[in-house]
Amino acid sequence: MKDIPIHDKIDIISLRDAGIYDDIEETGETYEQNAIIKAKFATEKTGLPAFADDSGLEIRALNNKPGIYSARYLGEDTPYAVKMEHILAELKNKDRFACYKCAIAFVTPTGNVTTSMGILNGDIAFERSNGPYGFAYDKIFYIPDYQKTFADLPPEIKNKISHRAMALRNLFNHYVTI
């Protein structure tokens, strides 16, 4: 998220930048709940306002799977290449509509919690791209308006149109006063 321009008065540091390397267990049942868990953790550890996200890929023909379990789909240690090939095989002759969803939670040291959602609609491509950008499922997430997968879009475009960028813009434009 550090690469997405948010506001010129905000300096973003990651937990690692702050010397915090703890794993945060995502026990929520929604993107929003997981984002809140992570943001509260960061605020408790640093004493600073914090925001965190939780994101996932939802595929209509797969009953919105992998969803909040996107990173753990088919097992945490399963490489994304295997996960993507599995999805492509599952979608033979099926509806390919999909969306990336992102929930952002902003938590203050006084306990105020604000959340925002961003959704980017697209399709699952028919084959995996070799695009150099992105991670996770970006090589199979196709953006019809650009006629490219997310992995084929350069960062300057992705950082404007992504589900994370939408959620951040919404959060800072409507809810957070700086």
Task: Set out the residue ranges of the language-model regions.
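Anionic-ligand binding patches
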Residues: 1-178
